[in-house]
Amino acid sequence: MKNFLAQNNLFAVSAGLKEAALNTEQTLNTSMLLNISSIPMALDRRSEDNSNEAHGKEEPDTIYRFGATGAGAYPVERAQAQHFAFLLSYGLGASAPAAWGTGFKHTITPIASIYNPGFTSALRLGNTIMKRRFASNYIDTVKATFAKDSWAKIEAALKATGKYTDNMLKETVNAAYNALSLTLAANAVHGGDAATRLDNVHRIRVKVPTTGEWQEVTYSAVSAATPAVITIGAPGGVITPTDYEILYVPAEAAWCTFPARVTEPPLRVSNLLLKIGGKWDGSVFNGGRTLDAEVESMEYNLTNQMKVEFRTDPTGATSGKYANYAMREGRIQTIALNREARDFILEQMMIDEEYSGIYIKATGAEFESGKNYFVEGIFPRCAVLKAPLIVNGKVIAQAGDIRILEDDTYGSCKWIIANKVSGY
């Protein structure tokens, strides 16, 4: 029986292998945990009808289709170091690993180029419904949230060119209208047993010879041979040749085998260090005030303003089916800090028009003695834009709006993430 429960969905990416060029698929090397309610990437098909054309009818009668792009969201409710490393590496653009015991520290920084690295993704829906691979995925936005009494969270908005590959195939076979079996042209049907092969045939329909409409055809068995032979119920009683359309999963390509998932413990916000007002000297964050139980939440936001478009294609490689242009229009980074208003510090920083650094570090469990999973964020130059006073329940609080700026020497940010993955 076909299994279409969302718990069986799988999502894989080329986390450690960026694409060499636009619309050039890479090898999938990591399966990622997936929120059960999330479809991380889907096609956004583009079409228009002819309602603005005079065509002799009141209502439109034609649809013009012109390709697709891709879009999706990838939220992680219990974020691990690997999720930060993957999303920030592709969101900011540069990641440099260095060995650290049996693990690695990944130093992630913004690139100057307006062309961010792309990765390949693939999605399995249910257990037997379909698999689809997407080329050239890009991180449009990232939001990382550290809120009281919760797990660290991270989510990304994704954009893609719309180039995709399915594990499905539609094949037309010409046979008699009263045929009892159909033989595929060359392919086997995927599956190691009879029940799986039968599930992997999604539909057979026949064109009625006399009237021209399509009718569904029953089928009961699929052979293990190459090409496969499918046993059907004869749709008619005459020998007249006609077309049968068969929608099925052929013997799968290598990309259809999803890679292993990396297992890490999630990060808990109770193990968060947050400093504001200090200075980064390139190796150490000096000074600053450590914020502790007063913090309700801290949220980091990255926006890349990714533009994915159809442009002229002299080679004709895209056939107008997917975009051939992806550019980052300008990076914006902000921090939202919600805290109890126990002091006048944020107000004074605004009065003084102060530029200063912010430092965060979320520490997880050890992966070896003395070495922990961690996510560390350094922002050398920040400014508090506003911090309106509010009443949160029965306490006075502040919602700080902080802009991350680009420092002349150290740039806008540096993330250092430790885990056991060799690179992103």
Predicted regions, residues:
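Signature of extracytoplasmic/envelope-associated structural regions
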Residues: 1-424
